[in-house]
């Protein structure tokens, strides 16, 4: 499956906001000109139409979670099938992905790093190794770093970085044993206020 392997800062500049694609060890410095889009004429951001705003919002969220278009569309279809607010359900599905939960628990510095950790069989769910990044974590599931992976320096660094992030009410993490439990469904109020999921729903509803 194709993945974007280019500069992470370029994607954040395109969307005009930090997509949290980098570890956070270093702040977005002057080299990452967040106020200007990438390219020769990046300083002049075009005025977007309603469709353009919807498309940019979809691209922003898709890139934030590191998901390709086809898979992202499937999440929308699944969210629209379920009862309740489609936008909130879409974000809940994205947040419940195993790679995202690993990132949220602080076992990886970025979602891309979490994805790699899962694919390389460094993560267990309920005592069983799971190497599927898109696997949906359910309430009550226990996610843990495998014993042989616990000594990896990148995991130790990620745990230290996570101490500076806001704690989430829907997960409970034990940093000593490197395991965590999903206590409840992801809470929209604790997710980025910079996401306007309604624009994504409007785009796909056309």
Curated annotation (Swiss-Prot):
GO molecular function terms listed in the Swiss-Prot or TrEMBL record: rRNA binding; structural constituent of ribosome
Keyword Nucleus tagged: no
InterPro entries, per database record: Ribosomal_uS4, Ribosomal_uS4_bac-type, Ribosomal_uS4_CS, Ribosomal_uS4_N, S4_RNA-bd, S4_RNA-bd_sf
Residue ranges of domain S4 RNA-binding in the record: 96-158
GO CC annotation, single: small ribosomal subunit
Entry's transmembrane regions: none
Pfam families assigned to the protein according to its UniProt record, in alphabetical order: Ribosomal_S4, S4
Keyword Ribonucleoprotein: yes
Keywords: Ribonucleoprotein, Ribosomal protein, RNA-binding, rRNA-binding
GO BP term, example: ribosomal small subunit biogenesis
Classification via SUPFAM superfamilies: Alpha-L RNA-binding motif (SSF55174)
Quaternary assembly: Part of the 30S ribosomal subunit. Contacts protein S5. The interaction surface between S4 and S5 is involved in control of translational fidelity.
Function field: One of the primary rRNA binding proteins, it binds directly to 16S rRNA where it nucleates assembly of the body of the 30S subunit.
Similarity comment: Belongs to the universal ribosomal protein uS4 family.
NCBIfam families named among the record's database cross-references: PRK05327.1 (NF003717), rpsD_bact (TIGR01017)
Name under which the protein is recorded: Small ribosomal subunit protein uS4
Origin species: Francisella tularensis subsp. holarctica (strain OSU18)
Gene (UniProt): rpsD
